[in-house]
Amino acid sequence: MRSSCVLLTALVALAAYYVYIPLPGSVSDPWKLMLLDATFRGAQQVSNLIHYLGLSHHLLALNFIIVSFGKKSAWSSAQVKVTDTDFDGVEVRVFEGPPKPEEPLKRSVVYIHGGGWALASAKIRYYDELCTAMAEELNAVIVSIEYRLVPKVYFPEQIHDVVRATKYFLKPEVLQKYMVDPGRICISGDSAGGSLAAALGQQFTQDASLKNKLKLQALIYPVLQALDFNTPSYQQNVNTPILPRYVMVKYWVDYFKGNYDFVQAMIVNNHTSLDVEEAAALRARLNWTSLLPASFTKNYKPVVQTTGNARIVQELPQLLDARSAPLIADQAVLQLLPKTYILTCEHDVLRDDGIMYAKRLETAGVEVTLDHFEDGFHGCMIFTSRPTNFSVGIRTRNSYIKWLDQNL
C-alpha cells in the first residue's frame, strides 16, 4: 500500500512537472492553457517519434491525431444547413443560415482555417462550430475551404486551392444557387488561414475581373512575414503556447519544403542579415521600430545581423514572395484592398505581424479596425466549447462576429 502511494505521488509530480510552464499573469485561464499546451506537446512528441521510426511524416501523424479526435460530419440543424461539396475540385463545407423573407439574398464569408498550412481541417469540431455560429448569427452563407496541406503539397499550392475555390464561388450562377448578395462577401481566416486570406485579397486586386469583388477582409492573428523572427512579440512570447517561436519557424520551413538545418539560423535572423542583398529592399516594409506603437516596442531592440547565411534566401526565395508574406507587398497593392479587420493577441508571437499590417494598410488609405486582446493567446478564438472553452475565446469570437454583422 505504501509503495503504491509513493508511486502515485511520483506520477502526479511528474505529470505536474510536464504540464506546468510559466505563463504571464494576464493570459486567459492559465491552468487550462497549460493543460491544452501539454496535450498538444504530447501529440507532437508522439508524431515526432513516429517520424523518427520511419513510419510516417510527423505532420501527417500529428494531423491524424488532431482530425481523429475532432472530426465532425456535416450535420444540419433547424437553423443552419451544412453540406460538403467541392468548388472546382477543391473540397468545401458550406453553412447556410436561416432564410429571411425580408432579405432574399444573404451575405457571405469565405473562411480559411489555420494550422500552419499543415494541420487541422474545415471539418473538425472547432471550425465547424465557428462557422455554424457565423451562419446562424449573421444569417449568412459561410464557405469553409478544405485546402490541401503540407506535406502533400507545398507553397504556393495552398494559395492556388483557396483562390480556385473562391473564384468558383463568385461565379454569378453559384452565388445565385446559394442566394448570396454579390456585393456583401468577405474573405477571412485565422493564423495560416489569415495568411492565405490576405494573399488572396492582394491577388484579387491585381485581377481586373475580380477587383472589388470582396467587400471586406477579416484576418485573425494572421501569419504575415518570415523575414524577422525577432519582433517584440517574437521576443516576448518566444516560448508561449500554443505557438512558440521555434515551432512557427519550423512551419515556415515545412511550407517551403526547406531544410530543418536552416531553422536555428532563421531564428536569429541570419537569413535577412545586412549582407543578404535580396532582402535589403524589403526591410523598410516591416521595420517595427516605425510601424509599432511604443506600447508594444517597450525596451526590445531590433536583431539585425551584419553577416549571415545568404544561402537560405537563395534556396528558399519564397521567403521574399508577397504571396507567402503579405506584409511585404507593394503599397500600390495595399491601397486597393477592402475595409479590413485584424484581430491580434498579446501573448502571441504573431501579434506584431497583424499590428504592422494594420499600420501599412492605414498608411495606404485602407479603413482598418485593429482589435487587440490583452489576455489573448494564439488560436484562442476557436476554443469556445467544453472542455477547451476559454473566456477570451468566447470574447474574441463575439467581437469578430459583431464586426462582421456591423460591416458586411
Swiss-Prot record:
Top enzyme category: hydrolase
The taxonomy runs: Eukaryota, Metazoa, Chordata, Craniata, Vertebrata
Q: InterPro entries per the record?
A: AB_hydrolase_3, AB_hydrolase_fold, Arylacetamide_deacetylase, GDXG_lipolytic_enzyme, Lipase_GDXG_put_SER_AS
Q: Which residues lie on this side of the membrane: Lumenal?
A: 26-408
For this protein, the Enzyme Commission number is 3.1.1.-, 3.1.1.71
> Where are the glycosylation sites?
N270, N287, N389
Q: Which organism is it from?
A: Pongo abelii (Sumatran orangutan)
| Biological processes annotated in GO | ether lipid metabolic process; lipid catabolic process
> Cross-referenced PANTHER family, in alphabetical order?
AB HYDROLASE SUPERFAMILY PROTEIN C4A8.06C, NEUTRAL CHOLESTEROL ESTER HYDROLASE 1
Q: Its GO CC terms?
A: endoplasmic reticulum; plasma membrane
* Chief location of this protein within or outside the cell: membrane
Instruction: State the span of motif (Involved in the stabilization of the negatively charged intermediate by the formation of the oxyanion hole).
Output: 113-115
**Membrane disposition:** Single-pass type II membrane protein
Return the protein name: Neutral cholesterol ester hydrolase 1
Q: Which residues form the active site?
A: S191, D348, H378
Q: What does this protein do?
A: Hydrolyzes 2-acetyl monoalkylglycerol ether (1-O-alkyl-2-acetyl-sn-glycerol), the penultimate precursor of the pathway for de novo synthesis of platelet-activating factor. May be responsible for the hydrolysis of cholesterol esters (such as cholesteryl (9Z-octadecenoate)) in macrophages. Also involved in organ detoxification by hydrolyzing exogenous organophosphorus compounds.
Query: What stretches pass through the bilayer?
Result: 5-25
The protein's GO terms of the molecular function aspect are: acetylalkylglycerol acetylhydrolase activity
Q: Which family does it belong to?
A: Belongs to the 'GDXG' lipolytic enzyme family.
Topological domains, Cytoplasmic: 1-4
Quote the catalytic activity from the record.
a 1-O-alkyl-2-acetyl-sn-glycerol + H2O = a 1-O-alkyl-sn-glycerol + acetate + H(+); 1-O-hexadecyl-2-acetyl-sn-glycerol + H2O = 1-O-hexadecyl-sn-glycerol + acetate + H(+); a cholesterol ester + H2O = cholesterol + a fatty acid + H(+); cholesteryl (9Z-octadecenoate) + H2O = cholesterol + (9Z)-octadecenoate + H(+)
State the compartments where it is located: Cell membrane; Microsome
Reported modifications of this chain: N-glycosylated.
Q: Which Pfam families match?
A: Abhydrolase_3 (PF07859)
Q: Keywords in alphabetical order, please.
A: Cell membrane, Endoplasmic reticulum, Glycoprotein, Hydrolase, Lipid degradation, Lipid metabolism, Membrane, Microsome, Signal-anchor, Transmembrane, Transmembrane helix
